[in-house]
Amino acid sequence: MSRSRFRGRITGWYLMASSSGEKLDWCGCGRPPRIVVLGAPDKLNVSSAWKRLRPTIQSHAELIAADFEFTYDFSDKEVDLVIVIGGDGSILQSARQMGENQTPVLGINCGRLGFLAALSPEDFLDAWPKVCQGDFSIIRHLMLEVQLIRDDEVIAQSMALNEAAILNGPPFAILDIDLYADGELATQYRCDGLIVATPVGSTAHNLSAGGPILRRQLQAIVISPISPHTLTYRPLVDSADTRLELAVTEPNESTSIVVDGRILGQLKSGDRVRVHRAPVSFEMLRVPGQNDYRTLREKLGWSGRLALRQL
């Protein structure tokens, strides 16, 4: 059975004609999956991977759009699956792009590390026909909602898949950061910055700051100070349902709240940052053979003894 659809060209992205080969039953719906493909526009390896993978993708699915500028509006149409070609940065961008319209994501790694975009193009070619027949599981990952509050008004907000971080700026004086948990003062940090990370983000900036790695399915957050003035300030794991509020007593001129690597806003004296569980989760497809410990072994070199190079 074959089908084709053409819906024209929209600024920033292209709706593609697509055809399905054999009719696949997507999760009992009696039809092939409807998919959107996302990728970084400036990566040559993304473009070459798309050219290579496109025939296989379209042979089993209905391609709604191929968007390499991250402008597709996910509120317009029902989409079953998003394929992201790139690295973990592209996965984070896709989470921002979908907003409250989160759709299951399958990541193909064309970047360097690839914690989230775990499948190589070769692995994808093997897994894709099985995925289209329902041989996968969906893992729901915690997301955070971050709000910058000034004069009791929310002036900026965003959702985070990795982390929200208060980061220092020139003249790089040490910061005094008050942390409130569920309305109660938890502690007062003296440090260069503070990270609130999800389990997904625990292997990012949090790990570099000495924080623990959390299993991705955990409903928890980790709060990690950056270069704390006192060694007794250690990373803290708390429930994902805890509502946090952060306040910097005297921020520097460039002190900012940064969400998944993007500046949400610069902080002024009296500002507060609220961090709590987002109303939606980020959904990732997991194919057979994937698991957290395998990813850690392969990506962090937890494979056993390191071979010593002969001098």
From Swiss-Prot:
One of its GO terms (molecular function) is metal ion binding. It is found in: Cytoplasm. Pfam families: NAD_kinase, NAD_kinase_C. Keywords: ATP-binding, Cytoplasm, Kinase, NAD, NADP, Nucleotide-binding, Transferase. Its cofactor is a divalent metal cation. It catalyses: NAD(+) + ATP = ADP + NADP(+) + H(+). The active site is at residue 88. One of its GO terms (cellular component) is cytoplasm. NAD(+) binds at residues 88-89, 162-163, 190, 192, 200, 203-208. Gene3D superfamilies: Probable inorganic polyphosphate/atp-NAD kinase, domain 1, Probable inorganic polyphosphate/atp-NAD kinase, domain 2. Its EC number is 2.7.1.23. GO terms for biological process: NAD metabolic process; NADP biosynthetic process. Involved in the regulation of the intracellular balance of NAD and NADP, and is a key enzyme in the biosynthesis of NADP. Catalyzes specifically the phosphorylation on 2'-hydroxyl of the adenosine moiety of NAD to yield NADP. HAMAP family: NAD_kinase. Belongs to the NAD kinase family. This is NAD kinase. It comes from Rhodopirellula baltica (strain DSM 10527 / NCIMB 13988 / SH1). The gene is nadK.
